[in-house]
Amino acid sequence: MDRTPPPVTLAAARALRPPEGSRAAEVFRDDSVWIRFAARPTSGPQMPHSRDEFYIVASGTARYRWDSGETMIGPGDMMFAAAHTAHGYDQFSDDFSVWVVFYGPEK
């Protein structure tokens, strides 16, 4: 990338519309990182992904599950999901939303 993109506020991210069939809208993408924003992600297990990813809670609460445990999460909390590992959300509040950051090479 040859320039720094402008900041993306939470309000601006919430205004983005995800593509058909997706619950997450693209915020930024380049060769090494892909950032998406998801308001009310799908409940239950997520499909394992081919890249490592971080989730950062923007608002609300949910239960986050991964292959070896579960915990309640809220604003400011961050979760890591290694490529190809089972993970997901349930029991989320109506205002639950997360930043999704895929990074690094596909594995």
Predicted regions and their residues:
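Short strand-coil-strand connectors
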Residues: 31, 65-69, 92
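Short hydrophobic/aromatic-rich beta-strand segments that constitute the beta-sheet cores
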Residues: 35-37, 64, 98
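Short acidic-glycine-tyrosine-enriched beta hairpin
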Residues: 68-83
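Ligand-binding loop in jelly-roll beta-barrel domains
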Residues: 83-107
